[in-house]
């Protein structure tokens, strides 16, 4: 005889309230439009280029150092939510605007770090949280090493200390620095992006996939090749043990661009690092998991008060 407890719900189960429905994913284009409407746009006439930056929100300063490609609009959904708790700042790299005066051949990776400190001084920021993504993590780590007292905590996602490039790839980078236009005209761009990231955008996020392709295609080729060339010559391993700042390492467990070994190398070398492996996440959580990414960043940088977390449901 079948066990009736397996086929008939108990009174307690029948009376239990239904699980709340997950909210629909945010509309990325609407989020970007809102960010454009609300963010303050400024320009800093730095020693190497006229830097365009955007500021949104009130609270402790948080500087987001972006990845190697795409535009600030790809981070808009994350920034909109972080702006509820932080004064967020994001900026454009040299060469992103044709009139910014950047002479890319003269700009080193250390210069990019200098520019972060120049922007901080320009905005009269004392101490700030740093959040670096992908290529931006290399600038973040160097900044933490150079002046750790200015940064109480930092978060890096898709981080690495070094990347290997083949001779053919290095040659392609040199040629790329001479090409006009944006990455939208590069052959095989969509096929490569699809291989690396498409499976991390389920059907419910189809609009975000198209937006990602669009924004990625707006990246100018020459400055992108310049940044890739900087990465090809970079090795941060010697400075990692001397970084005393608390660092949270976020790594997608399905990241096809930055392999897990890079995360493990950083976790072993940084004295005060914590690591989080994000399930079912690739290299673009600011697109695929923007809302959750913002919550993780906010809750780790500003831990809960003794009376409870702001995101916890009330009993």
Across the structure, where does each feature detected by a protein language model lie?
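Flexible "cap/lid" loop of the alpha/beta hydrolase fold
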Residues: 145-146, 151-182
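Conserved HGGG/HGGXW glycine-rich cap/lid loop of the alpha/beta-hydrolase fold
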Residues: 45, 49-98
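Alpha/beta-hydrolase fold catalytic core
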Residues: 1-62, 85-86, 302-315
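Short beta-strand/loop motif that positions the catalytic acidic residue
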Residues: 243, 249-251, 255
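Catalytic active-site module of serine/aspartate enzymes centered on a nucleophile-bearing elbow/loop
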Residues: 273-315
């Amino acid at each position: 005889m079948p066990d009736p407890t397996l086929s008939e719900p108990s009174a307690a189960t029948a009376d239990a309230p239904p699980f709340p429905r997950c909210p629909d994913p945010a509309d990325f284009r609407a989020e970007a439009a809102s960010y454009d409407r609300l963010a303050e746009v400024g320009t800093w006439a730095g020693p190497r280029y006229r830097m365009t930056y955007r500021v949104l929100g009130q609270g402790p300063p948080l500087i987001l150092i972006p990845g190697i490609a795409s535009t600030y609009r790809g981070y808009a959904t994350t920034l909109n939510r972080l702006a509820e708790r932080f004064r967020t700042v994001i900026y454009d790299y040299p060469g992103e605007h044709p009139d910014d005066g950047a002479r890319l051949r003269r700009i080193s990776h250390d210069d990019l770090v200098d520019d972060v400190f120049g922007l901080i001084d320009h905005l009269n920021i004392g101490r700030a949280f740093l959040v670096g993504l992908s290529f931006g993590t290399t600038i973040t780590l160097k900044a933490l090493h150079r002046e750790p007292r200015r940064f109480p905590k930092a978060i890096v996602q898709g981080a690495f200390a070094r990347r290997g490039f083949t001779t053919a790839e290095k040659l392609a980078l040199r040629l790329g620095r001479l090409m006009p236009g944006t990455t939208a005209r590069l052959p095989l761009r969509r096929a490569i992006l699809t291989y690396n990231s498409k499976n991390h955008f389920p059907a419910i996020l189809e609009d975000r996939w198209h937006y990602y392709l669009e924004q990625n295609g707006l990246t100018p080729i020459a400055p992108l090749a310049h940044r890739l060339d900087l990465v090809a010559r970079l090795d941060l391993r010697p400075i990692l043990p001397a970084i005393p700042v608390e660092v949270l390492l976020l790594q997608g467990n399905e990241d096809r661009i930055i392999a897990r070994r890079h995360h493990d190398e950083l976790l072993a070398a940084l004295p005060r690092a914590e690591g989080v492996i994000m399930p079912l996440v690739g290299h673009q959580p600011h697109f695929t998991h923007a809302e959750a990414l913002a919550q993780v960043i906010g809750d780790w940088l500003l831990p809960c008060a003794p009376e409870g977390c702001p995101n916890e449901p009330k009993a």
